[in-house]
Design a protein with these regions (language model features):
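Glycine-rich, aromatic-flanked loop segments that form ligand/cofactor-binding clefts
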Residues: 93-96, 102-137
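Structured beta-strand/loop patches that form or line metal/cofactor-binding pockets in enzymes
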Residues: 1-45, 49-53
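Short, well-ordered coil/turn segments that N-cap beta-strands
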Residues: 95, 124-130, 154-156, 181-185, ...
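Metal- or metallocofactor-binding catalytic centers and their adjacent structured scaffolds
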Residues: 5, 37-112
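Active-site mouth loops of central-metabolism enzymes
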Residues: 127-142, 161-162, 191-197
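Catalytic core of soluble alpha/beta enzymes
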Residues: 160-163, 167-232
Length: 232
């Protein structure tokens, strides 16, 4: 079995754009769709999503176009070998481009095996719990109203994108914990990598006491020492 062709598209919906933190403009959401076809007619599909500040992005799709020739004529089931050959070398490769290829190759492997990918990997569940994720809203009352709407739709977990200002975020966290029963709905806070270490620890301790389920991305992703400090 060999890869015969690859198709990649960047698509963007004409929807309202949202802010995720006070220091960011409204974000443009772009989906990059990838399809890998074999000469036997088997197909693997994937999609990755990016947010950018000043326009829709094409760099993920363009990066895949540069990588695609390496994959043509190769065995799609040899994922580790393929990944070694497409690793970043002469020019940087966006992680999203590598992720799209990886997901499509796994999807293709599931189609070859004739079973859903989760089943091929040993999964025993036929459904998973979902959570809703908010944009940044203007004030606490707007968040409380939004949570009410999400509960009416059947959600039992909500992740907050907020102003990413510790005191304002704590004000919201206290308000939702007071207004709603945290034994029946889970809350999570996403700080979008905006906090300093001291603020991260302070906020983490308080929202833990408030019954929040998790605290996402308080520090820059590569601040490994900071995350070690937070998790001691």
């Amino acid at each position: 079995m060999k890869i015969e062709r690859i198709e990649v598209s960047a698509v963007a919906p004409p929807t309202e754009q949202f802010q995720w933190s006070e220091d960011l403009p409204a974000q443009y959401a772009t989906n990059t769709l990838l399809r890998i076809f074999t000469e036997d007619g088997v197909e693997g599909v994937s999609g990755v999503w990016n947010a950018t500040s000043y326009g829709f992005e094409k760099y993920t799709a363009e990066a895949i176009r540069h990588i695609a020739p390496i994959l043509i004529g190769r065995d799609p089931l040899q994922r580790e070998e393929l990944f070694f050959d497409i690793r970043p070398r002469v020019f940087p490769v966006p992680p999203q481009a590598l992720a799209a290829i990886d997901i499509a190759l796994w999807d293709l492997a599931g189609n070859v095996a004739g079973m859903p990918l989760y089943e091929m990997l040993g999964g025993a569940r036929d459904k998973i719990r979902s959570y809703a994720s908010t944009p940044m809203l203007p004030d606490v009352d707007a968040y409380l109203k939004f949570v009410e709407e999400l509960l009416a739709e059947g959600y039992t977990a909500v992740k907050f994108h907020t102003w990413c200002i510790p005191e304002k975020d704590l004000e919201l966290s206290r308000a939702v914990a007071k207004e709603f029963d945290t034994s029946k709905i889970d809350f999570m806070l996403d700080a979008e990598n905006n906090y300093e270490r001291g603020d991260s620890l302070r906020v983490a301790r308080e929202i833990e006491d408030l019954g929040f389920t998790w605290f996402e991305a308080p520090l820059p992703d590569y601040d490994l020492d900071g995350y070690r400090e937070l998790t001691r």
